[in-house]
Regions:
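Carbohydrate-active enzymes and regulators
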Residues: 1-229
Length: 229
């Protein structure tokens, strides 16, 4: 929920990746959302700055977790063969890796000033549709100069932790349902629990009804796989 824009500047490494200490000595130029970048196998450094809104600091809520959302135009149906990044603090200490299915960076509400670096590797999709046919993208010297990625999202947001936890609850129960026999009584109990959760959840106000929805799933999530002998 929410969304606060951040200031972004970039430096393109000439060819081979360089260490953090060398990269940050270069001149970073301002870029904005929609910027296209990253010919195959190139490395781009981003500096990201901003500030946590004062209203967030005053109204800090445990269930709202600040995080940096990052999207380089990812195809989230797959985890590899795309751009990946590593976030660093100002001292050069790695904070967290960024990838298509893991494209967020946690941020403390108490860390008012946002200032960090991203080392972005513009990996090309050499697999295609997993046919692994010959491709010019397999080598720097044969790859085209075309920019492969777009800076679609880079902002500070707040994630509703309880809504996220509900999504994990549902994912877990769906996994159980799919693994149980069709005539299993437990399978039907799980399906009924999902139905009860949906009845308790207000689709027009998920944030304020999520607790009621999760409550309907507590019983089936806490019960053992089989009765104790």
């Amino acid at each position: 929920i929410d969304g606060v824009p951040l200031s972004i500047s970039a430096w393109q490494a000439p060819r081979e990746p360089v260490p953090f200490a060398e990269a940050i000595q270069n001149s970073f130029e301002p870029v904005s959302l929609g910027w296209r970048f990253g010919r195959a196998w190139s490395t781009i450094w981003l500096r990201v700055t901003g500030e946590v809104p004062m209203s967030w600091q005053k109204d800090s809520v445990a269930d709202l977790a600040p995080e940096i959302q990052i999207d380089f135009g990812y195809n989230t149906s797959r985890s590899g063969f795309q751009a990946e990044a590593l976030a660093y603090d100002l001292s050069g200490k790695p904070i967290k890796a960024i990838a298509p299915k893991n494209s967020w960076l946690p941020w403390s509400i108490n860390n008012k000033q946002i200032d960090f670096y991203l080392e972005v590797a513009a990996n090309p999709d050499v697999a295609g549709e997993y046919t692994f046919e010959p491709t010019s993208f397999g080598d720097w010297d044969t790859a085209p100069e075309t920019a492969l990625y777009e800076l679609k999202t880079l902002q500070l947001s707040r994630r509703n932790v309880q809504v996220w936890e509900l999504a994990q609850d549902i994912w877990t129960i769906r996994g159980l349902i799919s693994s149980l026999p069709q005539d299993s009584s437990r399978r039907h109990i799980l399906i009924r629990a999902i139905e009860d959760m949906l009845d308790a959840l207000d689709p027009a106000d998920v944030a304020n009804s999520v607790a009621s929805g999760r409550e309907k799933l507590e019983g089936v999530l806490s019960s053992p796989a089989a009765p104790a002998s």
